[in-house]
Design a protein with these regions (language model features):
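Active-site helix of classical SDR
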Residues: 126, 164, 172
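Substrate-binding pocket helix/loop in short-chain dehydrogenase/reductase
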Residues: 102-103, 107-115, 208, 212
Length: 256
């Protein structure tokens, strides 16, 4: 455990925690002593993750099946968390999706689904868990946006994703401005391409390896743990004066 990132006794809620970046961040929080609440739609995988995290780190882990686009389910999750732990200190809005296609081919349904999950779902969770934080006078909200919420992308058509993640970037600023006086900080992480169990095969392909060398100043994609440390920083006492920021963790992709 790192004394600077110590989260002992705190309760961290992570959405989209069944796989990928959500699970990586949950592990990072657990390694620093935080009790966890894992939210996702894949109930069996959540239960398996909860058991593994409890065994490895000795923290309490609560697994809740939840669709973040349904307000009643999120409200139920908040009630369950408060009943068990009595507090919510950290919320990581990680759940999301990705519609890929040229703008002229995207349907209304595809566009609205993207916005519904990535933007509206993030707002629902921030609002509902934020109420508990407002009551407590303390909270750390970390929204997972994307580097494509900051810049456009000529490589692959994904206008709905860009629009939704750009919305998350500005939602972060708005909530930070509104809730800062109540002891709540709201920041976002804007990841580039990061290795996870879901992305490894794609990122290791010749096409993506060549793209990394051409487009990313560091010449590679993010490794496991390189996003987690940013999340830990934003959740920890080390970031008490950091609010309303959108931090790109992208190897420099957005600076060129």
């Amino acid at each position: 455990m790192n004394k600077y990132f110590d989260l002992s006794g705190q309760v961290a809620v992570v959405t989209g925690a069944s796989t990928g970046l959500g699970l990586q961040m949950a592990k990072a929080f657990a390694s620093q002593g935080a009790n966890l609440v894992l939210l996702a739609r894949r109930e069996q995988r959540l239960k398996e993750n909860a058991e593994a995290l409890t065994k490895e780190f000795g923290v309490e882990v609560m697994a809740l099946k939840c669709d973040i686009t349904h307000t009643d389910e999120v409200k139920g999750a908040v009630e369950a968390v408060l009943k068990r732990f009595g507090r919510v200190d950290i919320l990581v809005n990680n759940a999301g999706t990705g519609a890929i296609g040229n703008a002229e081919d995207i349907t209304d349904e595809q566009f609205m689904h993207e916005v519904n999950v990535d933007l509206f779902g993030t707002f629902i969770c921030a609002r509902e868990f934020g109420r508990a934080m407002l009551d407590a006078g303390y909270g750390r909200i970390i929204n997972i946006a994307s580097m494509y919420g900051l810049v456009g992308n000529m490589i692959a058509g994904s206008a709905p994703y860009h629009a939704a993640k750009g919305g998350v970037v500005n939602l972060t600023r708005a909530l930070a401005a509104e809730w800062g006086k109540h002891g709540i900080t709201v920041n976002s992480i804007c990841p580039g391409y990061i290795y996870t169990e879901l992305t490894t095969a794609t990122l290791d392909s010749d096409y993506f390896q060549d793209m990394a060398k051409r487009s990313i100043p560091l010449g590679r994609y993010g490794r496991e743990g390189e996003l987690d440390t940013c999340a830990l920083f934003l959740a920890s006492p080390m970031s008490t004066y950091v609010n309303g920021q959108n931090i790109a963790v992208d190897g420099g992709f957005t600076c060129v």
